[in-house]
Curated annotation (Swiss-Prot):
This is Sarcosine/dimethylglycine N-methyltransferase. It holds the Pfam family Methyltransf_11. One of its GO terms (molecular function) is dimethylglycine N-methyltransferase activity. The keyword Transferase applies. Changing residue 172 to R: Almost inactive. Belongs to the methyltransferase superfamily. Its EC number is 2.1.1.157. It comes from Aphanothece halophytica. SUPFAM superfamilies: S-adenosyl-L-methionine-dependent methyltransferases.
């Protein structure tokens, strides 16, 4: 097993566990798994998460109904349902967690969107799709889990049509991040490094893509993990026994690592947009 495969397997095992599924489903509101954009510090996580999706959609608002979109690392599929409902896009969800994918399919059925959204089990390092299949690629806070981010970008390039756009968010390290500063965060997600704006721009340039913008929102990373920690502490007892006490205690430690890393000045988060000529 390669290192990238091992990282992917760890991500799958983690998100498929009962404790992780129960935690994310209850705390995030059942639709999303990504970082929210907050107007106030005590805003519901669900509302902030939807605001992130809406803001990313603004970056691709010129695409018409019927646009083919691929969501890489789609989680519970909340973003796909938003795009299908509000923009009429046809969305394919690719995700490594079988548990999340089942929830995704179930909600699509319940919300009458099964004809607009397809859900695929798999890794974004080896996409099960034909070349030049999609108009738009989308990803939220997922690529960090890859042990081979360059391969993810190469696969994205393969399935994206000429004239297409790639919009994504990802918790990143700054381009000048000293070695060791983010170790507590990296150890938690079993990685040696995070991506960076410079890294993604460099790979995109090598692929012949055009950099469109980076909508920098790093402060929201701190806002988000602080809000999740508040909710965990407020609902600690109710989350058990669905989530084990050991899991919740580890999550508290991990959330504090993310908050401290975000405040360190060596993390970055926001919306990146690239265009493939």
């Amino acid at each position: 097993m390669t290192k990238a495969d091992a990282v992917a397997k760890q991500a799958q095992d983690y998100y498929d566990s009962g404790s992780a599924d129960g935690f994310y489903y209850r705390i995030w509101g059942g639709e999303d798994l990504h970082i929210g954009i907050y107007n106030t510090p005590d805003e519901p996580i669900y509302d902030a998460s939807v605001r992130t999706v809406s803001r990313i959609c603004d970056k691709i608002k010129n695409w018409p109904a019927g646009t083919k979109v691929l969501d890489l690392g789609a989680g519970y599929g909340g973003s796909a349902r938003y795009m299908a409902k509000h923009h009429g896009f046809d969305v394919d969800c690719l995700n490594i967690s079988l548990v999340q994918n089942e929830r995704n399919r179930q909600m699509n059925q319940e919300q009458g969107l099964a004809d607009k959204i397809r859900v695929f089990d798999g890794s974004f390092e080896e996409l099960p799709f034909e070349n030049k299949s999609y108009d738009v690629l989308w990803s939220q806070d997922s690529i960090l889990h890859s042990g081979n981010r360059r391969k993810v970008m190469e696969e994205a390039d393969r399935v994206l049509k000429s004239g297409g756009d790639f919009v994504f968010t990802d918790p990143m390290q700054t381009d000048n991040c000293p070695e060791g500063v983010l170790e507590p965060v990296l150890a938690r997600i079993h990685l040696d490094s995070l991506g960076s704006v410079g890294f993604y721009r460099q790979v995109a340039e090598e692929l012949g893509w055009e950099f469109v913008e980076f909508d920098e929102q790093t402060h929201q990373l701190v806002n988000h993990y602080s809000r999740v920690l508040q909710e965990l502490e407020a609902h600690y007892d109710q989350l058990q026994p669905e989530c084990s006490q050991e899991y919740l205690d580890r999550m508290k430690v991990g959330l504090n690592h993310w908050i401290n890393a975000g405040k360190s000045g060596y993390m970055a988060w926001g919306i990146l947009k690239f265009h493939k000529p």
